[in-house]
Amino acid sequence: MDHRLLEIVACPVCKGKLNYDKEKNELICKFDRLAYPIQDGIPVLIEPEARTLSSDEVK
């Protein structure tokens, strides 16, 4: 994941900051509790494609 991209992408729901989870290869929005997948190096920032984070994952 290109860290320069993290500086410009935002959560499509709340427009907030996304954090990269290297282990799961996802972009995380803690505010909306959503994890967006990264497929072939491309973030899939479509809400229906995101998975909901558990309360343990939000910490």
From Swiss-Prot:
- Which Cys pairs does UniProt list as disulfide-bonded? none
**UniProt organism field:** Photobacterium profundum (strain SS9)
Specify the superkingdom. Answer: Bacteria
> Its GO CC terms?
cytosol
The record ties this protein, via InterPro entries, to: Trm112-like
Family the entry assigns:
Belongs to the UPF0434 family.
Gene3D superfamilies tied to this protein: 2.20.25.10
| One Pfam family hit | Trm112p
Q: Which SUPFAM superfamilies match?
A: Trm112p-like (SSF158997)
Q: What is this protein called?
A: UPF0434 protein PBPRA2383
In the record, what lineage is assigned to the organism producing the protein? Answer: Bacteria, Pseudomonadati, Pseudomonadota, Gammaproteobacteria, Vibrionales
